[in-house]
Amino acid sequence: MEHLSKRILVVDDDQGILDSFEVLLGDRYDLVMTDNGYEALRIIETKPPRLVFLDIKMPGLDGMDVLKRLRKDQKKVEVVIITATHREETEREAKSLGAIDFLMKPLNIVEVERIASQILS
């Protein structure tokens, strides 16, 4: 199944983050949002995005587990990790699994827009 060229998936259990992405990018991109890792994997399978902003700490299936499954299944999607807690070993592991960037919360809107524009243009 082909991905939509401007589709972004945002995965975060914080509704405020999801709302921020909607305000920031909703008028320019096809945003799909979810608050859990299991739903994220289902969306990636059925409505493949080109870019995923993925929170690390979530109940159930966390962001690192989602990233590991994506790589195991050889899904070709760009992933940007977003997190409130920075640990160098987590960043290294995420990047070794193919994450293209690692952003700290609170998110820098200029950086989010730059990444979306760079990947989706």
Residues covered by each model-derived region:
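A Lys-centered signature of the CheY-like receiver
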Residues: 105
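Hydrophobic/aromatic residues positioned on beta-strands within the core alpha/beta folds
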Residues: 82-84
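Short amphipathic alpha-helix used as the core "switch/output" element in two-component signaling
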Residues: 42, 64-74
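Acidic catalytic/metal-coordinating carboxylates
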Residues: 35-39, 62-65
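Two-component/phosphorelay signaling modules centered on CheY-like receiver
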Residues: 15-32
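Receiver (REC) domain active-site loop signature in two-component systems and cognate sites
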Residues: 58
